[in-house]
């Protein structure tokens, strides 16, 4: 992925001085793959909040304590302080949804306590843009030096590669030319929608087409329709022109978020 350094509310913290690196992305922009790559390359553990019980005070230290021998726990905690090891905390947005605001802030208090005075970067934290901004403000209020990175949207060409990797239908291999034709038609049709809106510029089109949930929605459409010739003709029909295609994609994104975020994470906490 392509990263950009974002300005935080405090004076810009240099990459070398930061004790926590926060990585934000608008949606499913490869954060999971990035997390796994960092963990493998750096040989550091991952604390995935989407798979953990709702966090609160002592969740972080409790996790380490419960998964290590007492001696290993003490050594790893010391390594975090001395800059000899790090830990990845993933899925901040899921963690936020599963707990109370006080519980989430208590969890961040633990992170801040372990980070203040530490050498190196004890924590790398990832999540969606809105929650990462909240975490940044809270940690900075606790005098933690934060470096804020953002995963930039895919380019048009990398968007095509992303779609190709997520389309697994046999038709893609058997009818490669037809597949690429309809794939490119969809991308261009979305561009046509933005082009026809005078108040929306080319940059916003690139942000939309580079947004991973949009690409996942396109991939789902191509996975669900193996007859690419028929799909192309349907897309070209008068009732499926640019604006309807964009609406269809947005509806798919909303459905995916409902199934993955609201149904799985939020509703269980509301019905307890």
Model-derived features: where do they sit?
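Walker A/P-loop-proximal flanking segment of P-loop NTPase domains
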Residues: 1-20, 37
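Post-nucleotide-binding-loop coupling segment downstream of the phosphate-binding loop, primarily
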Residues: 21-86
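Extended hydrophobic
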Residues: 38, 132, 140-142, 153-160, ...
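Short, flexible/disordered intra-domain loops and linkers
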Residues: 60, 64, 96-105, 136, ...
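Conserved catalytic network of the ASCE P-loop NTPase/AAA+ motor domain
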Residues: 77-81, 113-120, 141-143
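Sensor-1/coupling segment of RecA-like P-loop NTPase cores
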Residues: 114-137
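Conserved P-loop NTPase "ATPase switch" module shared by AAA+ and STAND
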Residues: 79-104
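Short acidic, S/G/P-rich loop/turn micro-motifs used as interaction or catalytic elements
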Residues: 29-30, 52-56, 92-99, 130-132
């Amino acid at each position: 992925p392509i990263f950009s350094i974002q300005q935080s509310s405090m004076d810009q913290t240099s990459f070398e001085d930061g004790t926590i690196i926060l990585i934000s992305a608008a949606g499913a922009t490869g954060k999971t793959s990035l997390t796994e790559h960092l963990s493998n390359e750096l040989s550091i553990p991952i604390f995935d909040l989407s798979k953990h019980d709702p966090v609160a005070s002592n969740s972080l230290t409790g996790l380490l304590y419960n998964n290590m021998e007492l001696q290993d726990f003490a050594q790893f905690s010391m390594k975090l302080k001395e800059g000899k090891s790090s830990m990845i905390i993933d899925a901040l947005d899921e963690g936020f949804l599963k707990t109370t605001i006080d519980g989430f802030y208590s969890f961040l208090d633990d992170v801040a306590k372990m980070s203040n005075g530490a050498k190196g970067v004890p924590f790398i934290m990832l999540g969606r843009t809105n929650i990462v901004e909240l975490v940044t403000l809270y940690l900075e209020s606790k005098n933690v030096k934060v470096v804020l990175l953002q995963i930039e949207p895919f380019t048009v060409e990398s968007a095509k590669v992303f779609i190709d990797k997520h389309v697994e239908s046999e038709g893609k291999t058997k009818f490669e030319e037809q597949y690429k034709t309809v794939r490119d038609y969809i991308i261009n049709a979305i561009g046509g929608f933005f082009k026809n809106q005078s108040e929306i510029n080319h940059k916003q089109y690139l942000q939309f087409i580079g947004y991973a949930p949009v690409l996942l929605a396109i991939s789902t459409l191509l996975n669900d329709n193996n007859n690419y010739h028929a799909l192309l003709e349907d897309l070209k029909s008068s009732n499926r022109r640019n604006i309807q295609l964009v609406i269809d994609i947005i509806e798919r994104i909303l459905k995916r978020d409902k199934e993955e975020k609201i149904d799985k994470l939020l509703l269980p906490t509301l019905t307890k």
